[in-house]
Amino acid sequence: MDLSSLRPAAGAVKNKKRVGRGQGSGNGTTAGKGNKGQQARSGYQKPINEGGQVPVYRRLPKFGFTSLQRKPIKTLNLSQLEDWIQDGLITGEEISVYDLKALCSGSYADYFKILGNGEITTAIKITAHFFSKSAEEKIIKAGGQVIKAYRTLEEASKIRDLSVEEALLKPKAKLVKRVKKSAKP
């Protein structure tokens, strides 16, 4: 088997439907638009106007918003970590953010949260950004250690004074809002 012998799966690639190319094609003459009239002409769009009825976009209320500061968080259960340990994907007692990023291949997330679903039998030292209470308790009960990271890998790599491992664990500085003192009378 080599690269030249690879083919897409059956049914994965469809031919483009070419309309208006003769009656024998099945999509000729009217090109799938039916017979004459406004809907068969170019520029036709389905109307939003619903007559005197209140349109659907006004009937339904506005709901919520999308936060621009949202942190994409990848959640992992203890059962998943235990499976990785049993399969030999995790070797040793220490699991870093690098390991989590590598094991969750294709993950868009910058932050990792460990959840307490399942059991863990191995004593591990794990570094992640967030832990649920139950996950933290189960890891410590198994003889492990929980370390909270404060930064993403990208942020940590930009700090020049520290190694990436040290920078991950360094808390971010908090912005302190200063109150202006009133002018003296």
Curated annotation (Swiss-Prot):
Q: What does this protein do?
A: Binds to the 23S rRNA.
**Which segments carry the region annotation Disordered?**
1-51
Q: Which UniProt keywords are given for this protein, alphabetically ordered?
A: Ribonucleoprotein, Ribosomal protein, RNA-binding, rRNA-binding
Q: How does it assemble?
A: Part of the 50S ribosomal subunit.
In the UniProt record, what gene is named as encoding this protein? Answer: rplO
What Gene3D superfamilies does this protein's entry cite? 3.100.10.10
Q: GO MF annotations for this entry?
A: rRNA binding; structural constituent of ribosome
- Organism (species): Chlorobium phaeobacteroides (strain DSM 266 / SMG 266 / 2430)
Q: What processes does the entry annotate via GO biological process terms?
A: translation
Q: List the disulfide bonds.
A: none
Pfam families linked: Ribosomal_L27A
Question: Which stretches are tagged as biased composition: Gly residues?
Answer: 21-35
Gene Ontology cellular-component terms for this entry are:
cytosolic large ribosomal subunit
Q: Which family does it belong to?
A: Belongs to the universal ribosomal protein uL15 family.
The name this protein carries in UniProt is Large ribosomal subunit protein uL15
